[in-house]
Amino acid sequence: NTALIFAGGSGIRMNAKAKPKQFLELNGRAIIIHTLEYFENHPEIDSICIVIIESWIDYLKELLERYSIKKVKWVVAGGITGQESIFNGLQAIYKDCDHPEDCVVLIHDGVRPLINDTLISDNIASVRKFGSAITVSPVIETIVTANENNQIQSVTDRKLCMHARAPQSFILKDIYTAHLKAIDENIHDMIDSASLMKYYRYKLYTVDGPVENIKITTPMDYYLFRAIYEARENSQIFGI
């Protein structure tokens, strides 16, 4: 089982002028290290591939050495789009895999550090049983659609709605084949792996994840991460 960590973002929405958002720190450790440690310490994860902005590869390798992240087997330069970046990582894994029909790959965001061991295990189990695992969390507030005049068109039943999050996990052969088809058909702008697999009519199955499993994209996300992280730390220290 392999984790593919996408860390190709530049941090524009975060206003992170000095560093990409995945390298912003909390308690002295970069966000991507917080994320990687879950996969590094999980007994069912055998290897890790990281897709990163090419100019930051050397800095990432320094962090991996400093924090003893040993399972990283591939560090790959990202592409122009997120889809291309994920393909670059999948291709590196695929070339080294003797049995891609039996390899589970968990695709996760480097800036989504509030995961847990259970979520990783549940993703792997779902792929083994069904062939895919799309992490979701419940929609808490009401979802509406509006027209170009800002007039409400519909109110969607919340019970039917979920947030698609990560990890998004698949059999390596399936997701790699889907990416090859997309390249052949000149499709380069799929928003994520689940959308790509759905487009090619693969069956997708949900795995419930924690509400706090947010992607850190804006300053507000970072402050939420800090608050939740500190709450987790306090609960361990004080038994709250």
Report residues per predicted region.
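N-terminal glycine-rich phosphate-binding loop and ensuing alpha1 helix
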Residues: 1-58
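Residue-level signal for inorganic ion chemistry
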Residues: 5, 32, 89, 109, ...
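Conserved N-terminal catalytic core of the sugar/cofactor nucleotidyltransferase
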Residues: 33-102, 183-185
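Short aromatic/basic micro-patch
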Residues: 25, 114, 169, 215-216
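Hydrophobic packing residues within well-ordered alpha-helices of enzyme cores
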Residues: 14, 39, 60-64, 123, ...
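Hydrophobic helical membrane-anchoring modules
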Residues: 213-240
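Conserved core of the sugar-phosphate nucleotidyltransferase
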Residues: 101, 114-207, 240
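Short aromatic/hydrophobic "clamp" motif used to bind/position activated sugar donors
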Residues: 105
